[in-house]
Design a protein with these regions (language model features):
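Conserved alpha/beta core of the MobA/IspD/sugar-nucleotide pyrophosphorylase nucleotidyltransferase superfamily
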Residues: 92, 165, 178-270
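A short acidic, helix-capping loop that chelates divalent metal ions and anchors anionic groups
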Residues: 13-18, 136-137, 204, 242-243
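Hydrophobic/aromatic residues located in beta-strands of well-ordered beta-sheets
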Residues: 5, 48-51, 97, 125, ...
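N-terminal glycine-rich phosphate-binding loop and ensuing alpha1 helix
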Residues: 2-53
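Conserved core of the sugar-phosphate nucleotidyltransferase
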Residues: 107-208
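Short phosphate-binding loop-to-helix
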Residues: 56-117
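Short, high-confidence coil segments that cap the C-terminus of an alpha-helix
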Residues: 46, 92-94, 121-125
Length: 270
């Protein structure tokens, strides 16, 4: 089965225009994310990657560094729509599509590999999560005091499929102190915004209108649940550099501070 990792990279952003070209420790964000996709594709059989953009500046930047890139329609409403457009332009014989968000430059290669493995094992849609330690949960709660819509939680059933995604921290924890004494891990699962689709499921997904809870939460994956598509959840280890993505210029400084502590995962000439 053939897989394609798509990195949607849109120039326009209300909070951070030109974000894909922003430098993090001297390397552009789109180049960092494409590097992750490229390394994952090189590790797997029958796998390729491509950057999908609507902007000539981003395309030229990718070409300068030898990165695969295609131009997609500027009116694509979501990264999933852009990913599907990339498949139709770049690799129509694709079976599985991985949507690696362009503002997630610190995604571990192992996470992408785990998602493609789940698709090969029969998942219609697969997405990763980490189970939070109590200290990580405390940090998430503090973060949400400043930015309430940062970070997404997922409820997972016994079949390892998603029951609900929310920008609230779910589930609520009654008797939390006792839970803290029982385990170093909290019951909270934090969703990582990476999606793997069977191509036919992605085609159906983008054809459906925005769903009720998707609109309320601002989470497009809820469209899948509201249309009865099972979403397999794949547990992964927390990344060495843990960020929610790069959404503002201030996030660049935070990312560079983390690089200074943990080292730079980028593989390639600066």
């Amino acid at each position: 089965m053939k897989s394609l990792i798509v990195v949607p990279a849109r120039y326009g952003s209300t909070r951070f225009a030109g974000k894909p070209l922003a430098l993090i420790n001297g390397v552009s964000m789109v180049r960092r994310t494409a590097n992750v996709a490229q390394r994952a594709a090189q590790t797997l059989d029958n796998c390729d990657y491509v950057v999908a953009t609507d902007d000539n500046r981003i395309a030229a930047h990718c070409q300068k560094y030898g990165l695969s890139v295609v131009m997609t329609p500027p009116d694509s409403p979501t990264g999933s729509d852009r990913a599907l457009s990339a498949v139709k332009i770049y690799a129509q014989d694709t079976d599985f599509v991985v949507n690696l968000q362009g503002d997630a430059p610190f995604t571990p290669v192992s996470t992408i590999i785990a998602i493609i493995k789940a698709l090969n094992e029969g998942a219609q849609v697969a997405t990763p999560y980490t189970q939070l330690s109590w200290s990580a949960l405390d940090k998430l709660r503090e973060q949400k005091r400043q930015t309430p819509f940062s970070g997404t939680s997922v409820l997972i059933g016994q079949d390892n499929r998603a029951l609900m995604f929310s920008k609230n921290i779910i589930p609520a924890l009654r008797g939390e102190q006792a839970l803290r004494e029982q385990s170093p891990l909290s019951p909270i699962c934090r969703h990582i915004g990476l999606y793997g689709y069977r191509l036919d499921v992605l085609e159906r997904f983008v054809s459906w209108p925005e769903s009720h809870y998707e609109r309320l939460e601002g989470l497009e994956q809820l469209r899948l649940l509201e249309n009865d598509v099972p979403v397999d959840c794949v547990r992964v280890e927390p990344p060495r550099i843990a960020t929610s993505g790069i959404d503002t210029p201030e996030d660049i400084a935070r990312a560079e501070a983390l690089i200074a502590v943990h080292g730079d995962p980028f593989e390639g000439p600066i």
